[in-house]
Design a protein with these regions (language model features):
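Active-site metal-binding loops of divalent metal-dependent hydrolases
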Residues: 24-26, 46-47, 79, 97-102, ...
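Portal/gating segments that form or line small-molecule/metal binding sites
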Residues: 51-95
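Active-site-proximal loop/helix segments of hydrolase catalytic cores
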Residues: 80-141
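Active-site metal-binding motif and surrounding structural segment of the metallo-beta-lactamase
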Residues: 27-66, 110-120, 124
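Divalent metal-coordination and catalytic microenvironments
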Residues: 13, 41, 74, 99, ...
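Conserved beta-strand hairpin/beta-sheet module of binuclear metal-dependent hydrolase folds
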Residues: 1-29, 79-98, 118
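Binuclear metal-ion centers of metallo-dependent hydrolases, dominated by the metallo-beta-lactamase
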Residues: 2-6, 145-201
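Zn-dependent metallo-beta-lactamase
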Residues: 1-16, 28, 61-70, 188-201
Length: 201
């Protein structure tokens, strides 16, 4: 599986057969994205669908529930107008927190994503999760890989904290990647890995 980041909260996951996209939109009213092409497109905020350019054949998920598309399993739960997702793709468990704010994860929410292999979560503060809050969530979920989103490097004109603030708070040496390629058998078994992705054009 290859994970790519296109800025803010826009991620694409793909293998040789299928693909999945999270949140193909920006919130700064300036960022422009090309048409999102994937088998499955997930939205944390259904109100943003109108802003996104989507291929007509994609299966769109914009509400909580359970879904299965091309052997990709999706579980969505709404928390204060934001849908968090738990996805199983190629046997890898991915927790995606979308535009999660300053709330604590309730027990039921934590049960959904606890033990995920990969955790993608905002770290840039503002209306979204701060570095300190993100670090607490990571301790609760205990993922093997952490991928930060919504930090200054990919947020366009939005005000957001630098990724360096999160790195300092989290205390794990990061690995910077253009794209993150991972197979289930290669997931780290002991120490958590922090992956900082560069934005794709």
């Amino acid at each position: 599986m290859i994970i790519s980041w296109y800025g803010f909260n826009y991620f694409k996951l793909k293998n040789t057969s299928h693909s999945l996209i999270f949140n193909p939109y920006g919130l700064d009213k300036v960022s422009k994205f090309s048409k999102a092409k994937a088998d499955l497109i997930l939205f944390s905020d259904p109100n943003q669908i109108a802003k996104a350019k989507l291929n007509k054949d994609a299966f769109i998920v914009d509400s909580p529930g359970e879904y299965e598309v091309n052997d990709i399993f999706v579980y969505g739960r709404e928390i204060k107008n934001n849908i968090i997702y738990y996805v199983v793709f190629e046997g890898i468990k991915i927790a995606f927190l979308g535009e999660f704010g300053h709330d604590d994860l309730a027990n039921g929410d934590l049960e959904l994503i606890e033990g995920a292999d990969i955790l993608i979560l905002p770290v840039g503060g503002g209306d979204l999760t701060t570095s300190k809050e993100a670090s607490k969530i990571i301790q609760q979920v205990e993922p093997r890989v952490v991928i930060p989103s919504c930090h200054k490097a990919g947020s366009g004109k939005l005000k957001a904290d630098n990724i360096a603030d999160f790195v300092k708070e989290f205390g794990v040496k990061p690995e910077e990647e253009e794209k993150y390629k991972i197979k289930k058998k290669d997931l780290p078994q002991e120490d958590v890995k922090l992956i900082i992705l560069k934005t794709q054009k």
